[in-house]
Amino acid sequence: LPDTIINVYCDESCHLENDGFRSMVLGAVYCNADKTKDLSRKFRDLKRKHGLAPEFETKWTKISPAKQSFYSDLIDLFANEADLRFRGVLIPDKSVLDHRIFDQSHDDWYYKMYYLMLRQLLLPNSSYHIYLDIKDTRGADKTRQLHTVLCNDIRDFDCSVVRRVQQVRSHESELLQIADLLIGAIAYESRNLTGSRAKVAVIDRIKARFGHTAISRTSSVTSRKFNLLVWRPKEDGQ
């Protein structure tokens, strides 16, 4: 039997070393590749239902009172679709990092965090197509390096498990936009922000569906639908 192909859509928030933000979030929404078209169609149908154009790009930063019900419904769509899952890593405080101690650059650490996020998803009986929304100019280098790191770390030397790591722009992928929404909520909560009632309402919907601490504490290992790791550096190595 052919193995299962999983599409993984990754996004990142505040990942640069000196960007002025304390926290950083990486997140991935993933599903079987053969479900992607149907799920994307449901996403576009939801946009139409709320009077939005199908090509409207969903983003955490675009949440407004007028669109709050759409974004809350989108959380419900994600929650109700058994084929869609989320895995995230929250780094609450980048300022505690001291890469010199561990003889690594910020980029080395960045790939390590991506591996930490993705390794829980990578099963030997499946193959993975990983799509990254990389927002800086070094995207091509980062995708190549991440592919190498992932394959080496799981001993996938012929790249039969991690078949593909490539860039995609978020406006080209509905599922990537869901990742943006979820990591935006995690980042907002981690900074204790409350200025936008609409954003707080969307966060409340996430908590109602996945638990009050879903976006602020490490999930149990058995949480497969919505899984978050809150990462802090250890004394013996990052």
Regions found by a protein language model. Give the residues of each.
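Phosphate-ester processing/binding pockets and catalytic centers
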Residues: 1-238
